[in-house]
Amino acid sequence: MEEFRMYRDHTKVIQIGNKKIGGGNPILIQSMTNTKTENVQATVEQILALEAAGCDIIRCAVPTMEAAKALKEIKKQIHIPLVADIHFDYRLAIAAMENGADKIRINPGNIGSTERIKAVVDVAKERNIPIRVGVNSGSLEKELVEKYHGVTAEGLVESALDKVHIIEELGYDNLVISIKSSDVMMCARAHELIAEQTSYPLHVGITEAGTLYSGNIKSAIGLGIILHQGIGDTIRVSLTGAPLEEVKSARRILKTLGLRKGGVEVVSCPTCGRTQIDLIGLANKVETMVQDIPLDIKVAVMGCVVNGPGEAKEADIGIAGGVGVGLLIKGGEIVKKVPEDQLLDTLREELMNWDSNKTQK
């Protein structure tokens, strides 16, 4: 893949459990459970499924002391770093760290007095647990809204840095910053601004992005703009839907930007009057079929035997459909003709026997 990205290569390295972020380490995918954290079994089952899908870091809501204590048992049964999401009650942050949280997410502005923030920081310092300082456009301080005549990227950055300075003044800098907005361009601008002013790792995402359809579009555009500039160390695709879909989308975004390998990429033509088969159905079946195949290749699914071979040239392997008969294509060359009803099975067999060392690019 031709390289056009800029790199923010001075990012501070932060250890989160068994993972490192920043300093040129790979961008990690994060999601958040939607189970009741107090329900250990349900939460563990969901996390294990997310792990299998490619989730690198998982965050759990900790609204109660029971949830904080549940982290200890959850932690024993999972294999990725566990982040505790804390609001308002500093005691929950302390309990979460005491029960195995690898990182905590707080907003110092709603934790309370300096003494309470210090109590949290002291435990984090003692255990060397990173703190993610999060700000959100929906809760920007009134004085900053007034100062900037509304919710702006500049206001979000000032809010984030103010909160970071509170913790720095307490002698701690094991920090990650997140700035979230549902406004894509505001979010992108805020990340550009803060990347110029600090070397802390940044967790990136478009908050309240929406449903699977609209949320994926907003997240892909927003994350694409930000990541293309070399900004971002962890990402989350926030969707109103199953966390598993967040991870799938995040993997696809990183792969599309050339930031992560692995996983089959399916390309297919948009259909036209020359389409001779049920291409939509076939393409969907192929995409479902390849979800769990760990090959780093491109598969083309084309709708006619006239233009299909040419359009599939950039793919490693492809199929093109025709009336009653289709084509199997490798490296842009027609390998053989295949009965139409055997196209999917033929492709599956080829992928199962694929030799990655002979991948044609």
Region locations from a protein language model:
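N-terminal amphipathic alpha-helix/helix-capping segment at the start of soluble metabolic enzymes
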Residues: 1-32, 125, 288
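Active-site mouth loops of central-metabolism enzymes
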Residues: 24-42, 61, 80-88, 144-157, ...
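Hydrophobic faces of well-ordered beta-strands that scaffold small-molecule active sites
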Residues: 27-33, 58-60, 82-86, 104-106, ...
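Glycine-rich, proline-tolerant flexible connector loops at the mouths of alpha/beta enzymes
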Residues: 34-40, 51-74, 105-113, 175-184
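Alpha-helix-loop-beta-strand connector modules within alpha/beta enzyme cores
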Residues: 65-86, 119-131, 193-202, 286-288
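Glycine-enriched alpha-helix->loop->beta-strand junction motifs that scaffold or abut catalytic
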Residues: 77-80, 97-104, 125-128, 195-201, ...
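Hydrophobic or amphipathic alpha-helical targeting/insertion segments
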Residues: 91-132
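Catalytic alpha/beta core domains of metabolic enzymes, predominantly
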Residues: 136, 144-291
